[in-house]
């Protein structure tokens, strides 16, 4: 009886209005907080300087290309102390993400838009990974903004603990999720394309507000702040941006023959394929793209594109011609003309900077970029000595980075980008 009287008193006429006023006040405060002038908010606690694995290393000098400091990094990496440093495992991340508030605070994720301009231009990301949970955490933290959207595709062959750790990280954010369908990714096969398509579909259905989609892998890292990325995307004015060039003759074998996955490897079966169901010739490119939401919608819904993708499923490395070709189909939103004058090289496209071993050399003698010391599948794994040069290219992201090969390169780049982003907030 007393409880009924209390409920009646609690929800009496004036009290109802009190709760309505309270709810309105909370909503108003939240909106004002998002749109307030950021210079009145102190983000100093989000700096990453103290995370430097060694106080002996000066990241400012590294970024300036100081030869002595870069040599110090190499020597530091050889020390027993550094090699035996504590590293977080999949299980560490599973445990840490059990308390999301603590995880977000400890890992210093940015939880508010840093500017009105960024808040008004949300970006979607597709991230394809299969191992190295700390790299995923570092990548996500470096690009994370609460107004953006993130789909993480975990290879179905990955360790269960890695998947659980990725799910744990994603569960701490309302705008981060693991793809609804996971593929068993085989190198150079259609499964790599399908992984991105799964995230495309999920991101398209999740939110209608994002402007552009950028696809990444676990060994990519940004070389621009979110604000810089937003401004570069705005300059595209709805056009897509990716590598798309005339198909070289030596790559035609890749789509003229039928391929199948045999014992975990893509194998040429020796049989000829029919001509692709397109009037557009095939163009060469890469797996990396920056595409508009309208492009994504067209790819997911257009029947001719669906037929083309079905045809491409038994070819070699379809990701290296599929997106490039779709970008040259006249009806596709944000596409380019078929004319060779519109060919776009990997150095001209902003999606990703990759240093190929066979193009490295003396820049003063015409090489596109200087040499690199460590390579994986002919691709440079960036070290601390590459950062000074790397920060002068116009690309949004670079590939590859690896904490097991050069932790300092990632740490110094991470520090630099975070400081640069927060520095813009000062009056």
From Swiss-Prot:
Covalent S-S links between cysteines: 59-412, 100-172, 151-199, 372-380
Gene Ontology CC: Golgi cisterna; Golgi membrane
Residues involved in a glycoprotein binding: 243, 251, 254, 320, 341, 358
Subcellular location: Golgi apparatus membrane
Annotated metabolic or biological route of this protein: Protein modification; protein glycosylation; Glycolipid biosynthesis
Principal place of residence: Golgi
Region described as Mediates interaction with GOLPH3 and is necessary and sufficient for localization to the Golgi: 5-9
Annotated region described as Stem region, given as residue ranges: 33-121
Transmembrane portions of the chain: 10-32
Membrane-topology descriptor: Single-pass type II membrane protein
GO MF entries: beta-1,3-galactosyl-O-glycosyl-glycoprotein beta-1,6-N-acetylglucosaminyltransferase activity
Sites where a glycan is attached: 58, 95
Substrates-to-products reaction catalysed: a 3-O-[beta-D-galactosyl-(1->3)-N-acetyl-alpha-D-galactosaminyl]-L-seryl-[protein] + UDP-N-acetyl-alpha-D-glucosamine = 3-O-{beta-D-galactosyl-(1->3)-[N-acetyl-beta-D-glucosaminyl-(1->6)]-N-acetyl-alpha-D-galactosaminyl}-L-seryl-[protein] + UDP + H(+); a 3-O-[beta-D-galactosyl-(1->3)-N-acetyl-alpha-D-galactosaminyl]-L-threonyl-[protein] + UDP-N-acetyl-alpha-D-glucosamine = a 3-O-{beta-D-galactosyl-(1->3)-[N-acetyl-beta-D-glucosaminyl-(1->6)]-N-acetyl-alpha-D-galactosaminyl}-L-threonyl-[protein] + UDP + H(+); a globoside GalGb4Cer + UDP-N-acetyl-alpha-D-glucosamine = a globoside GlcNAc-(beta1->6)-GalGb4Cer + UDP + H(+); a ganglioside GA1 + UDP-N-acetyl-alpha-D-glucosamine = a ganglioside beta-D-GlcNAc-(1->6)-GA1 + UDP + H(+)
Region called Catalytic, residue ranges: 122-427
Protein function: Glycosyltransferase that catalyzes the transfer of an N-acetylglucosamine (GlcNAc) moiety in beta1-6 linkage from UDP-GlcNAc onto mucin-type core 1 O-glycan to form the branched mucin-type core 2 O-glycan. The catalysis is metal ion-independent and occurs with inversion of the anomeric configuration of sugar donor. Selectively involved in synthesis of mucin-type core 2 O-glycans that serve as scaffolds for the display of selectin ligand sialyl Lewis X epitope by myeloid cells, with an impact on homeostasis and recruitment to inflammatory sites. Can also act on glycolipid substrates.
Name of the protein in question: Beta-1,3-galactosyl-O-glycosyl-glycoprotein beta-1,6-N-acetylglucosaminyltransferase
Native source species: Bos taurus
Gene that specifies this protein: GCNT1
């Amino acid at each position: 009886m007393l409880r009924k009287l209390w409920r009646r008193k609690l929800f009496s006429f004036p009290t109802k209005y009190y709760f309505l006023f309270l709810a309105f006040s909370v909503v108003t405060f939240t909106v004002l907080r998002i749109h307030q002038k950021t210079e009145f908010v102190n983000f100093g606690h989000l700096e990453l300087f103290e995370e430097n694995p060694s106080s002996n290393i000066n990241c400012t000098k590294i970024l300036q290309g100081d030869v002595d400091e870069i040599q110090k990094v190499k020597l530091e990496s050889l020390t027993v102390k550094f090699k035996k440093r504590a590293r977080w495992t999949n299980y560490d991340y599973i445990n840490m993400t059990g308390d999301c508030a603590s995880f977000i605070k400890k890992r210093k994720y940015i939880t508010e838009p840093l500017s009105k301009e960024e808040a008004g231009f949300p970006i979607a990301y597709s991230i394809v990974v299969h191992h190295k949970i700390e790299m995923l955490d570092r990548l996500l933290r470096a690009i994370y903004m609460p107004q953006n959207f993130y789909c993480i595709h975990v290879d179905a062959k990955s360790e269960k603990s890695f998947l659980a750790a990725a799910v744990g990280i994603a569960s701490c954010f309302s705008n981060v999720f693991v793809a609804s369908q996971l593929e068993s990714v085989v190198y150079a096969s259609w499964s790599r394309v399908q992984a991105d398509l799964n995230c495309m579909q999920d991101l398209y259905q999740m939110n209608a507000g994002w402007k552009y989609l950028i696809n990444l892998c676990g060994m990519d890292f940004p070389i621009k702040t979110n604000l810089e990325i937003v401004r570069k995307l705005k300059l595209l004015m709805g056009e897509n941006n990716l590598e798309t060039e005339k198909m070289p003759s030596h790559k035609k074998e890749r789509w003229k023959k039928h391929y199948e996955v045999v014992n975990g490897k893509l194998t040429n079966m020796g049989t000829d394929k029919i001509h692709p169901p397109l009037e557009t010739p095939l163009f060469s490119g890469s797996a990396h793209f920056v595409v508009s939401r309208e492009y994504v919608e067209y790819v997911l819904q257009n029947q001719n594109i669906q037929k083309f993708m079905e045809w491409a499923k038994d070819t070699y490395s379809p990701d290296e011609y599929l997106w490039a070709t779709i970008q040259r189909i006249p009806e596709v939103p944000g596409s380019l003309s078929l004319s060779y004058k519109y060919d776009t090289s990997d150095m001209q496209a902003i999606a990703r900077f990759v240093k190929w071993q066979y193009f490295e050399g003396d820049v003063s003698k015409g090489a596109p970029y200087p040499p690199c010391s460590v390579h994986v599948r002919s691709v440079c794994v960036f070290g601390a000595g590459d950062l000074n040069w790397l920060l002068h290219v116009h690309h949004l992201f670079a590939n590859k980075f690896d904490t097991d090969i050069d932790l300092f390169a990632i740490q110094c780049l991470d520090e630099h980008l975070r400081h640069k982003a927060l520095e813009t907030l000062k009056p």
